[in-house]
Design a protein with these regions (language model features):
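Alpha-helix capping/helix-boundary segments
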Residues: 7-8, 38, 70, 93-94, ...
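Short, well-structured N-terminal submotif of metal-dependent ribonuclease cores
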Residues: 1-34, 43-59, 123-124
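Generic structural signal for small/hydrophobic residues in well-ordered secondary structure
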Residues: 4-5, 42, 74, 98, ...
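A short, glycine/small-residue-rich beta-strand->loop->alpha-helix junction that serves as a flexible
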Residues: 85
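Acidic, PIN/NYN-like endoribonuclease modules and their adjacent C-terminal/linker elements
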Residues: 95-124
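A general structural signal for well-ordered alpha-helical segments in protein cores
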Residues: 18-19, 39, 51-54, 71-74, ...
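Acidic catalytic patch
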Residues: 40, 61-82
């Protein structure tokens, strides 16, 4: 499973429901992964003093790299959904990563990922 930036943000904010949901998913054997896009989005919006906690959380998760083929899929997502659904590059890259690896995406913002059929809405 890939977790979207919004799920990671809720964990960093100390949301107990989201944290418990993520812990339960991990304990049940789900591999929890993220896209480098999420790491960039979160670091960009973080205070310097928050970066240690952010780095620690990311180090506890597996990253799925962005490959050339991921870029192709993201371009296809943008071509198809940018105008009709206001899909942005970051979300297109996250969606493409999920598609390429056959992973579910955990997000609170399913509307940002119109091309994905395997979306999970975590507890909030």
């Amino acid at each position: 499973m890939i977790i979207d930036s919004d799920v990671i943000i809720e964990v960093l904010r100390g949301n107990t429901k989201t944290t418990a949901w993520l812990r339960k998913a991990r304990d049940s054997g789900s591999a929890i992964r993220y896209s480098p896009v999420s790491r960039a989005e979160i670091r960009a919006g973080a205070l310097v003093k928050e970066r240690g906690a952010i780095s620690a959380l990311f180090e506890s998760l597996a990253v799925l790299p962005i490959e050339a083929s991921t870029g192709d899929l993201a371009g296809d997502q943008l071509s198809r959904f940018a105008r009709s659904h206001s899909v942005q590059l970051g979300d297109a890259l996250i969606a493409a990563t999920a598609l390429e690896h056959g992973e579910e995406l955990a997000t609170f913002n399913a509307k940002h990922f119109p091309g994905l059929k395997r979306i999970i809405a975590p507890d909030r």
